[in-house]
């Protein structure tokens, strides 16, 4: 805000012809100046338009109201930037700014022509945009009609007319395209233009396919974006993120192309293999049959089809591929599956298949088809693609979108902060001016009245003054006083003003961001503000007038859950500390009102930043009251004649009328100026001063009123009717009720009721008995009654005014009202949905459950921020839905027989808008491939592919990832750890604490009673007793020191269980904010804080609160240790107590004690004397065992045994019975393993002792697993092996591999990270379950018992409802026929448990369509379903997917990533303690240290070799090779299945040419580079590829002849793809992304190992439980749990949650007729093929949660983390490449790699580098100033140069020195040769020596000259005077010479940098070397000087 415009109408000036002439004059002036100024640098900041006055924004507050005659009229531009540009502005009633070009529109209409003026008036009118908006919406509604009636044609014309009118108005008002702000200069208008042009084209010109052109009308929907302001920014963010995605997109396309080529080579033509019938009729051949096949029936006649499948069964020729059933053979014939669209036959289809794999859509189908056709070994291909392609690339897209959003967000926050600051400054300036003006007015009035009374003897001052002060101002003042009194008298104690203070306009982002404070300016100003001995409390000003304190700044600066009142209670005026937290949060302290505990109204007001004057000058003056007044450089008022109005003394302290505000004084100035008499004598000036005061007052009033939430009458009404204080009795009654209702126990009771009510609702199921139904109904009545009573009582206790100010209460009242309404309307048909509202009660739990609260907040915040994004998404969905309907609707209708046998529309079609919308929504969910096949079949491939890909990329990848990015950004680690609890939420904790205390008290009394009764002396140690005393003390005050001192005295942490709550939660009164450090800065300050009586403060004390300086040592131990591990927070001994003891076992070779101290103390027999006798022998045995166990070989042996025993489990598959020998070997092996593990356990017991063994979690794991083996061993020996329990125990052996966890470091790290994350994962899991519970109960209400249907069991089809309307009819049919069945869906909503399972299938989008179809077809309980009868049930699923799936599942990602980062912080050691600055240096040095100068490959001496060398090392050669690689790639893409012989030959020869070319390259390089060729990695890679290509070419025939496996041949052909990978070398962006992947690899390998372990265990479980289930759905002859390999194949598929519904379905068959419990399996003793539903559900759900949600998300977390690191690396000022470049240039200057270059070459070297290291010539002075060390021969070491150059880039820094020594040690180790050299001098010293030498020489010359002159002068003595002059002149000339040489010198000495120290030389040597060096230097100087 450079200029504060004068408030009121002065700012606005009509735009007239004079204005235009003035502008033209300014332009002419500017042009005349321009030629002179052209030389100015472009870097200088050009003036920019003001962001507040941009077109389209609201006019800033400060300009006040627009004078009546100026609305919608052309005005002069307010923005100074446009002063010399031909523009003018127009303001409409809503104060929106419109900017127009002042040149004639269309070359005809000047700004003053009536037509243009009318157009402008229409354009700026708010109704005009409303009209357009309504037109667009109506038009959209018409667009959704699929068969519009004829009359809509006319409506269409109307729309076109309106749009044309709109464009005409715009063109007339703005001009067409010449000049700024004209019609076509706004890109959004291009859209309108195109739409209108197309509308007319389609009308008047016949363009053929009209429907395609009509789809262009859809773009009109995009116009909504240009009309709604917030949307433009989101679209901006989207476009930004798409730009940022370019690199990732290129990488994705590149990777997919490579994978597609691999797929093409491996699986070309494989998917055409089918099972063909053997028995052909007479003389039929395959060819003849293929020619006759036409319809589906013909195909089914000859090929083998599975029931319900559309495609023939695939098979393969290799042993591990799918086999055909008997009577069929495998042939390659016919088309590919899925209408022929799924194949690897050409590059394009292979690319589509890979894209589908990457997006993981229905990929299990592709996986199964491919493995069936090619063989199971190719699973490896899928593993690589899923892990690299899918997980990595998709998440990179997420990472990029998230970063783009984050950057955009940061920018917005910064801008908003700036605005708030500017606004605040303006307000403060206005206030100050207002005060000054008022003071002047008062003084003037007083002066007038005194003069009058002198003259007339009468006092008429009052009337005179009232004339002067305007009436409105007076009214305002009165109103203000009234309001203040009213406000302060009303019950503000509850902090309700907080509710009023948030201004309506603030949005959540701003609110979140502002408490960050405006760091930079503030710190500086606060230092200036508070004088040393003065409390900041006294910085007062009108800023804190009472009126302001209740409603404040535009955006309230809310500190995190803390209010100032509590802070200022302990700040006493003299010594309060201005804590760092406050300066960080940026609020000024405010005096606290004594009658309020929590003065939240002040807390709101005070969060405004300090006033920063516009001109940057701030003077603070302390007046006689010690009040700091801020005097701003230009705050004084300007008078018309340019005089400053001085400040005024106001004699009496002006306090507000209201008594309660007497602490908040107005600013008084005691040291001010008096008004000059002549000034007051001037009546004009006086009048001016007073009116000025009133104007200012009005402006400030208006500003503040504009920020009120509600109009004033509302407050009057509220006070009258919503506060009930009728009579004293009523008030007493009210207090009683208040006391009861607000009691923590009542809260607890209500919470228990909520839980019970939820349970009651969750108990509904189908079928239910009548009694049960009645119980539930009565329960509902009771709970409704309880909640209604609670609401009524609270209303009485709090008054409606108070009650409705609390969010939770509003929520409660809504739910209670709805429940009551539902009770009355229970019997009305169709209103059963109201029952679902009861479910919202579950959310009341959030009040007392912080995580749920946080989740709701996160969703709330996101929805706030997502509002605009959701709108954009909705617009996109709408547009694509309409496009789909317009383009493909007809085709679906006409060609429906192609995709459906009975020629009816399928469920997913685009014939009408709703179905079209559903398809687009399904694509957004990531399911696009199946609907796309249908679309391609009916409407042609090209259009469908384009539309689907656009929806997929725009909708799914970009917008949905932006959703996720928003979610992740609302997750900051604070949210999870320090959940801000609302004080009321603690009521529950208080209640629980009371109960605990009661129980403890009862226990203690009982214990004491028993002890007394048995008259034993209690053996409770003193410490324990003291700790208990401490715990039960009921003192109300505790000082922050005494606690720590008591803790030191009593060692109360010894009693671990007592204080387990220590450090768990923060007491609400003790500290209001966890980051506050209010006493830490002042150790002597002791603060006493009231604590609620009877509440123990120990359990609420936070560890951080103890860390005040006085007890820092104790607290350090406490804090450091508590963060180290999750499990051991309590047993932290105090310093000096257990430290040594703990450290011992680490170092000693001796075992620890066997038993715990408690055992030894109780049972003296455990005490053994180890000095003598048996004890000594025992001790020696223990020591021997200890040595054995600790030996590394022992550990390796055990690991081997674990691996072998785990491996043995993998053999126990379905075929074990047939392999007798293996079975016997395994049985013996199992016994041996068991014995070995028992032995290991015993050894460890003896070696470590029970205490150590059983306090280690990993040992417990070992112990339990060994127990299982032991029990099964004993059972087998006793012959009980067939018992049920023993069998189930045997399956637990699958856990054996878990023992490997603790043995592998990598996996242990991951597991520890996971274990650390478990609490928060469980928390989120619970919250998700609660969230889903609501949907599950709703599902039960909607669908329970409605999924039954009557089916024909022969083909599984459903009888039409017209034939079989209900259950009874179906049963009648069943009696007649065997093939009829009344069957329920396996996964349904019959109870809450099954509801959860159904929701999980919907949320993972697996098997969800079947559930959805059943729901949409459902009619009623026991009724036969009808096709799409309840069509709008789709909406239930859409809503669930948005909230249940997008939000909650992504929340998991959020939690895991968050946790991951927190853990990293905990373990991250050094990184956290480095500043950003240090990190920069550290990273640069890290890179720098890893490099060293290499000798360039020498150019060979031989002439021919030399020429080849020049050719090969030329950049053009590299580029041409890259081009060849690309061409090679293209030729490989051309290859396809079934190509002609001719084409095959052409491609073969092309390939031969490429092989020759690449071989040629290889040979040329070998000739020229000789043995150096193999020193470069890429060359080796090329060499290998060339060799394999040649071998492959020659061996192709051999392989085909002898080894008939085409697979091997194919794999060899893949080698050619290796050449493509060389492209990566060239692209920097891609390299960054791959660098991120390389950085992730170690971590990803660990996670992969863990995933493999989980899969291994689950595979063994699966084999033992589900090996024999019936083969249907997803389980068949290849994909099953019969063998270990098959189980792994299935589990890999479910890792991405793909197809788990199909694998679960057969396991849910539990009884006939679904399965046969008596079925015999040949070769096995197992009977039946039924599954176990509960085990199956647990198995799959747990596996999905562990693998899909946890492990896979950790994978994502690692990638996101490393991506941000990699991008940081690439944006750092110095990257790897810069150092590489340095060394590349170095090689040219130092061909022998001596690591030195001569000083003379340095200048050229510095100029030869690329930026940022480049130092362009002239660079001599800069280089000398670097003070580089030189060795003999004036040579400088490369690292010294690099170090100095690096420092120059990164900037001088104090932290540099601390790191320097470390760095150099690293360089020394990397470059040993550096150690040996000793610098003699430095460049700076050398220069100084040179300069000294020239100075000495010149002095000597001057001296000689003088001598000569003297001699001459003595001869010519007569002309002495003249000679003297001459001499002086000469002297001066010499002095000048001398001075001229000095700038170099001063310039050189100005650098104070010292040369680097070389720490690897040991200190004494170093000192000696320093000494030698100085001596040498001195000698050198002496000798030089003597020479001279």
Curated annotation (Swiss-Prot):
Effect on the protein of changing residue 869 to H: In PERYTHM; activated at more negative potentials; slower inactivation kinetics than wild-type channels
CDD domains membership: Na_channel_gate (cd13433)
Keyword presence, Repeat: yes
PTM characteristics: Phosphorylation at Ser-1490 by PKC in a highly conserved cytoplasmic loop increases peak sodium currents. Ubiquitinated by NEDD4L; which may promote its endocytosis.
Bias type Basic residues, positions: 474-486
II repeat placement: 726-989
Effect of residue 1490 to A: Abolishes stimulation by agents that stimulate PKC activity
Membrane topology, Cytoplasmic segments: 1-125, 173-185, 228-241, 403-745, 797-805, 849-865, 968-1187, 1251-1252, 1305-1317, 1458-1514, 1568-1576, 1628-1640, 1760-1988
Disulfide bonds: 275-324, 897-903, 935-944, 1350-1370, 1715-1730
Effect of residue 826 to L: 8-fold less inhibited by the spider protoxin-II
Residues in IQ domain copies: 1889-1918
Activity regulation, free text: Inhibited by tetrodotoxin. Weakly inhibited by saxitoxin. Inhibited by the spider huwentoxin-IV that binds the extracellular loop S3-S4 of repeat II. Inhibited by the spider protoxin-II that binds the extracellular loop S3-S4 of repeats II and IV. Inhibited by the scorpion alpha-toxins CvIV4 and AaH2. Inhibited by the conotoxin GVIIJ. Inhibited by the spider beta/delta-theraphotoxin-Pre1a.
Glycosylation sites: 209, 283, 1352, 1366, 1375
Consequence of changing residue 823 to A: 9-fold less inhibited by the spider protoxin-II
Substitution effect: residue 1472 to T: In PEXPD; reduction in fast inactivation leading to persistent sodium current
Transmembrane domains' residue ranges: 126-145, 151-172, 186-204, 211-227, 242-267, 377-402, 746-762, 772-796, 806-822, 832-848, 866-888, 941-967, 1188-1212, 1225-1250, 1253-1278, 1288-1304, 1318-1342, 1432-1457, 1515-1534, 1546-1567, 1577-1598, 1608-1627, 1641-1663, 1734-1759
Known tissue expression: Expressed strongly in dorsal root ganglion, with only minor levels elsewhere in the body, smooth muscle cells, MTC cell line and C-cell carcinoma. Also expressed in vagus nerves within the head and neck region. Isoform 1 is expressed preferentially in the central and peripheral nervous system. Isoform 2 is expressed preferentially in the dorsal root ganglion.
Annotated consequence of substituting residue 827 to A: 13-fold less blocked by the spider huwentoxin-IV, 3-fold less inhibited by the spider protoxin-II, and has a significant impact on channel activation by shifiting the V(50) towart 0 mV when targeted by protoxin-II
Biased segments, Basic and acidic residues type: 26-39, 489-510, 573-585, 1962-1988
Biased composition (Polar residues): 1120-1131
Effect of residue 778 to A: 5-fold less inhibited by the spider protoxin-II
Renumbered ranges of IV repeats: 1497-1795
Effect in UniProt of substituting residue 822 to A: No change in inhibition (IC(50)) by the spider protoxin-II, but has a significant impact on channel activation by shifiting the V(50) towart 0 mV when targeted by protoxin-II
Family: Belongs to the sodium channel (TC 1.A.1.10) family. Nav1.7/SCN9A subfamily.
Function, in words: Pore-forming subunit of Nav1.7, a voltage-gated sodium (Nav) channel that directly mediates the depolarizing phase of action potentials in excitable membranes. Navs, also called VGSCs (voltage-gated sodium channels) or VDSCs (voltage-dependent sodium channels), operate by switching between closed and open conformations depending on the voltage difference across the membrane. In the open conformation they allow Na(+) ions to selectively pass through the pore, along their electrochemical gradient.
Protein name: Sodium channel protein type 9 subunit alpha
């Amino acid at each position: 805000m450079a200029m504060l415009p004068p408030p009121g109408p002065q700012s606005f000036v009509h735009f007239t012809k004079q204005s235009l002439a003035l502008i033209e004059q300014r332009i002419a002036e500017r042009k005349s100046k321009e030629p002179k100024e052209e030389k100015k640098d472009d870097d200088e900041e050009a003036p920019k338009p003001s962001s507040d006055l941009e077109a389209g924004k609201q006019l800033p507050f400060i300009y006040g109201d627009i004078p009546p005659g100026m609305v919608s009229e052309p005005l002069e531009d307010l923005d100074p930037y446009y002063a010399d540009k031909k523009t003018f502005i127009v303001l409409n009633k809503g104060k929106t700014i419109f900017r127009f070009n002042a040149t004639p529109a269309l070359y005809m209409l000047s700004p003053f022509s009536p037509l243009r003026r009318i157009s402008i008036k229409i354009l700026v009118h708010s109704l005009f945009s409303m009209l357009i908006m309504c037109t667009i919406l109506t038009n959209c509604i018409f667009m959704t009609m699929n068969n519009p009636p004829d009359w809509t044609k006319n409506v269409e014309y109307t729309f076109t007319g309106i749009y044309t009118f709109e464009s005409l108005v715009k063109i007339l008002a703005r001009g067409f395209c010449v000049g700024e702000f004209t019609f076509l200069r706004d890109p959004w208008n291009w859209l309108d233009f195109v739409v209108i042009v197309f509308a007319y084209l389609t009308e008047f010109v016949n363009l053929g396919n009209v429907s395609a052109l009509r789809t262009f009308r859809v773009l009109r929907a995009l116009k909504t974006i240009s009309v709604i302001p917030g949307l433009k920014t989101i679209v901006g963010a989207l476009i930004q993120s798409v730009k940022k995605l370019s690199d990732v997109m290129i990488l994705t396309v590149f990777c997919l192309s490579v994978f597609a080529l691999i797929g093409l080579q491996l699986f070309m033509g494989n998917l055409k293999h089918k099972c063909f019938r053997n028995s052909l009729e007479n003389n039929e051949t395959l060819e003849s049959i293929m020619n006759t096949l036409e319809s589906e029936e013909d195909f089914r006649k000859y090929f083998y089809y599975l029931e319900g499948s559309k495609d023939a069964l695939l098979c393969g020729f290799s042993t591990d591929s799918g086999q055909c059933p008997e009577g069929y053979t495998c042939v390659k014939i016919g088309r590919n599956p899925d209408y022929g669209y799924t194949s690897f036959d050409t590059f394009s289809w292979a690319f589509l298949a890979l894209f589908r794999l990457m997006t993981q859509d229905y990929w299990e189908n592709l996986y199964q088809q491919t493995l069936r056709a090619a063989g199971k070994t190719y699973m490896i291909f899928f593993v690589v693609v899923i892990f690299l392609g899918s997980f990595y690339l998709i998440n990179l897209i997420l990472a990029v979108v998230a970063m783009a959003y984050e950057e955009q967000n940061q920018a917005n926050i910064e801008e908003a902060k700036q605005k708030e600051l500017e606004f605040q400054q303006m307000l403060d300036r206005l206030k100050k001016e207002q005060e000054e003006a008022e003071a002047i007015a008062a003084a003037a009035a007083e002066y007038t009245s005194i003069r009058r009374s002198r003259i007339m003897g009468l006092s008429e001052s009052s009337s005179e003054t009232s004339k002067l002060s305007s009436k409105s101002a007076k009214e305002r003042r009165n109103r203000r006083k009234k309001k203040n009194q009213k406000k302060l008298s009303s019950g503000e104690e509850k902090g309700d003003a907080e509710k009023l203070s948030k201004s309506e306009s603030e949005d959540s982002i701003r609110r979140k961001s502002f408490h960050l404070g405006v760091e930079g300016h503030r710190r500086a100003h606060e230092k200036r503000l508070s004088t040393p001995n003065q409390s900041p409390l006294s910085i007062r000003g009108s800023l804190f007038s009472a009126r302001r304190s209740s409603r404040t700044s535009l955006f309230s600066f809310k500190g995190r859950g803390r209010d100032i009142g509590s802070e200022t209670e302990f700040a006493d005026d003299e010594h309060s500390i201005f804590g760092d937290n406050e300066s960080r949060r940026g609020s000024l302290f405010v005096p606290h009102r004594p009658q309020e505990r929590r003065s939240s109204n002040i807390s709101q007001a005070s969060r405004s930043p300090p006033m920063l004057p516009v001109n940057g000058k701030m003077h603070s003056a302390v007046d006689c009251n010690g009040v700091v007044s801020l005097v701003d450089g230009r705050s004084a008022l300007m008078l018309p004649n340019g005089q400053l109005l001085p400040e005024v003394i106001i004699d009496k302290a002006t306090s507000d009328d209201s008594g309660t505000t007497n602490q908040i004084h107005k600013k008084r100035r005691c040291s001010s100026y008096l008004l000059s008499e002549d000034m007051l004598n001037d009546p004009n000036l006086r009048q001016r001063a007073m009116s000025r005061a009133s104007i200012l007052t009005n402006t400030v009033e208006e500003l503040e009123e504009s920020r009120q939430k509600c109009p004033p009458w509302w407050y009057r009404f509220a006070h009258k009717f919503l506060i009930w204080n009728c009579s004293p009795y009523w008030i007493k009654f009210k207090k009683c009720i208040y006391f009861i209702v607000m009691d923590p126990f009542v809260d607890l009771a209500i919470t228990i009721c909520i839980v019970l009510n939820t349970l009651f609702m969750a108990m509904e199921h189908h079928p239910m008995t009548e009694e049960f139904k009645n119980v539930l109904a009565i329960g509902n009545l009771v709970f409704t009654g309880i909640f209604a009573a609670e609401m009524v009582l609270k209303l009485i206790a709090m008054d409606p005014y108070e009650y409705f100010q609390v969010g939770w209460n509003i929520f409660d009242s809504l739910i209670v009202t709805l429940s009551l309404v539902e009770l009355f309307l229970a019997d009305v048909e169709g209103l059963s949905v109201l029952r679902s509202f009861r479910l919202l009660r579950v959310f009341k739990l959030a009040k007392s459950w912080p995580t749920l609260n946080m989740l709701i907040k996160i969703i709330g915040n996101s929805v706030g921020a997502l509002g605009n994004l959701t709108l954009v998404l909705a617009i996109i969905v709408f547009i694509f839905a309409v496009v789909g309907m317009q383009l493909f609707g007809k085709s679906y209708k006409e060609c429906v027989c192609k995709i459906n046998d009975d020629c009816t529309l399928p469920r997913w079609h685009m014939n009408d808008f709703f179905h079209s919308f559903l398809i687009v929504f399904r694509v957004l969910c990531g399911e696009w491939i199946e609907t796309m096949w249908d679309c391609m079949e009916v409407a042609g491939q090209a259009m469908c592919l384009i539309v689907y890909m656009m929806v997929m990329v725009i909708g799914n990848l970009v917008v949905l990832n932006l959703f996720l990015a928003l979610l992740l950004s609302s997750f900051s680690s604070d949210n999870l750890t320090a959940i801000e609890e609302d004080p009321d939420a603690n009521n529950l904790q208080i209640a629980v604490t009371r109960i605990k205390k009661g129980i403890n008290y009862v226990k203690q009394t009982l214990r004491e009673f028993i002890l007394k009764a048995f008259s034993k002396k209690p053996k409770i140690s003193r410490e324990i007793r003291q700790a208990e005393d401490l715990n039960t003390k009921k003192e109300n005050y505790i000082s922050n020191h005494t606690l720590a001192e008591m803790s030191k005295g009593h060692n109360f942490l010894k009693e671990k269980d007592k204080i387990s709550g220590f450090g768990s939660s923060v007491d609400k009164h003790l500290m209001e904010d966890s980051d506050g450090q209010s006493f830490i800065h002042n150790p002597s300050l002791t603060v006493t804080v009231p604590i609620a009586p009877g509440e123990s403060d120990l359990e609420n004390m936070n560890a951080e609160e103890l860390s005040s300086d006085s007890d820092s040592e104790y607290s350090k131990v406490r804090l450091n240790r508590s963060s180290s591990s999750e499990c051991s927070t309590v047993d932290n001994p105090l310093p000096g107590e257990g430290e040594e003891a703990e450290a011992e076992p680490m170092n000693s070779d001796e075992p620890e004690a066997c038993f715990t101290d408690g055992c030894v103390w109780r049972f003296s027999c455990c005490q053994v004397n180890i000095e003598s006798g048996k004890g000594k022998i025992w001790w020696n045995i223990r020591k021997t065992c200890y040595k054995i166990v600790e030996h590394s070989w022992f550990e390796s042996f055990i690991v081997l045994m674990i691996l072998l025993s785990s491996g043995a489990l993998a053999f126990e598959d379905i075929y074990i019975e047939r392999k007798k020998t293996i079975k016997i070997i395994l049985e013996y092996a199992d016994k041996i393993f068991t014995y070995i593990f028992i032995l290991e356990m015993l050894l460890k017991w003896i070696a470590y002792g029970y205490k150590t063994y059983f306090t280690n979690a990993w040992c417990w794991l070992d112990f339990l697993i060994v127990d299982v083996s032991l029990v099964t061993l004993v059972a087998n020996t006793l012959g009980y092996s067939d018992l049920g329990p023993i069998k189930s125990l045997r399956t637990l052996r699958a856990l054996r591999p878990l023992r490997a966890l603790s043995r592998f470091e990598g996996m242990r790290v991951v597991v520890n990270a996971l274990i650390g994350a478990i609490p928060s994962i469980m928390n989120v899991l619970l919250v998700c379950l609660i969230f889903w519970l609501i949907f599950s109960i709703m599902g039960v209400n909607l669908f329970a018992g409605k999924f039954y249907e009557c089916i024909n069991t022969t083909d599984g089809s459903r009888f039409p409802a017209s034939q079989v309307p209900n259950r009874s009819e179906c049963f009648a049919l069943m009696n007649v026929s065997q093939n009829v069945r009344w069957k329920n869906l396996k996964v349904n909503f019959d109870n809450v448990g099954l509801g959860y399972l159904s929701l999980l299938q919907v949320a993972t989008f697996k098997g969800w369509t079947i559930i959805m179809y059943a729901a949409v077809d459902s009619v009623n309980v026991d009724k036969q379903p009808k096709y799409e009868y309840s069509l709008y049930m789709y909406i239930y699923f859409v809503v669930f997917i948005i909230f249940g799936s997008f939000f909650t599942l992504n929340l998991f990602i959020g939690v895991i990533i968050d946790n991951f980062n927190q853990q990293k912080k905990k373990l991250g050691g050094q990184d956290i303690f480095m500043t950003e600055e240090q990190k920069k240096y550290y990273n640069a040095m890290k890179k720098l240290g890893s490099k060293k100068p290499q000798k360039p490959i020498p150019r060979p001496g031989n002439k021919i070799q030399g020429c080849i060398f020049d050719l090969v090392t030329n950049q053009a050669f590299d580029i041409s090779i890259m081009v060849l690689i690309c061409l090679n790639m293209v030729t490989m893409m051309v290859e396809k299945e079934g190509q002609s012989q001719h084409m095959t030959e052409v491609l073969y020869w092309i390939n031969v040419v490429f092989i020759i070319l690449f071989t040629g390259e290889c040979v040329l390089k070998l000739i020229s580079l000789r043995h150096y060729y193999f020193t470069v990695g890429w060359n080796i890679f090329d060499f290998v590829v060339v060799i394999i290509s040649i071998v492959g070419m020659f061996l192709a025939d051999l392989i085909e002849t002898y080894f008939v496996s085409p697979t091997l041949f194919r794999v060899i052909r893949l080698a050619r793809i290796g050449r493509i990978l060389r492209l990566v070398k060239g692209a920097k962006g891609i390299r960054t992304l791959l660098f991120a992947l390389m950085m992730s690899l170690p971590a990803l390998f660990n996670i992969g190992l863990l995933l493999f372990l989980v899969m291994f265990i689950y595979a063994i479980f699966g084999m033992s439980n589900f090996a024999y289930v019936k083969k249907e759905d997803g389980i068949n002859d290849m994909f099953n749990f019969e063998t270990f390999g098959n189980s792994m194949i299935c589990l890999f598929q479910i890792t991405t949650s793909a197809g788990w519904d199909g694998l679960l379905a057969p396991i849910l068959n539990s009884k006939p007729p679904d399965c046969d419990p008596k079925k015999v399996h040949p070769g096995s003793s197992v009977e039946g093929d039924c599954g176990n539903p509960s085990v199956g559900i647990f198995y799959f759900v747990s596996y999905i949660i562990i693998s899909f949600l946890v492990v896979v998300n950790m994978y994502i977390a690692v990638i996101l983390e490393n991506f941000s690191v990699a991008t940081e690396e690439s944006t750092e000022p110095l990257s790897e490449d810069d150092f590489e470049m340095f060394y590349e240039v170095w090689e040219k200057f130092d061909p022998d790699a001596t690591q030195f270059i001569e000083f003379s070459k340095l200048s050229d070297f510095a100029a030869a580098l690329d930026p940022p290291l480049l130092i362009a010539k002239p660079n001599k002075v800069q280089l000398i100033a670097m003070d580089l060390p030189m060795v003999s021969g004036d040579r400088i070491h490369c690292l010294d140069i690099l170090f100095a150059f690096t420092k120059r880039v990164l900037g001088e820094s104090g932290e540099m020195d601390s790191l320097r020594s470390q760095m150099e040690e690293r360089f020394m180790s990397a470059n040993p040769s550096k150690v040996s050299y000793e610098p003699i001098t430095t460049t700076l010293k050398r220069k100084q020596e040179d300069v000294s030498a020239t100075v000495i020489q010149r002095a000597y010359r001057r001296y000689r000259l003088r001598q000569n002159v003297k001699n001459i002068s003595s001869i010519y003595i007569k002309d002495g005077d003249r000679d003297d002059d001459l001499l002086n002149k000469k002297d001066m000339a010499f002095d000048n010479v001398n001075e001229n040489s000095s700038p170099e010198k001063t310039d050189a000495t100005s650098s104070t940098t010292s040369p680097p120290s070389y720490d690897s030389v040991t200190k004494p040597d170093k000192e000696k070397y320093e000494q030698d060096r100085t001596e040498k230097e001195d000698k050198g100087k002496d000798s030089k000087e003597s020479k001279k």
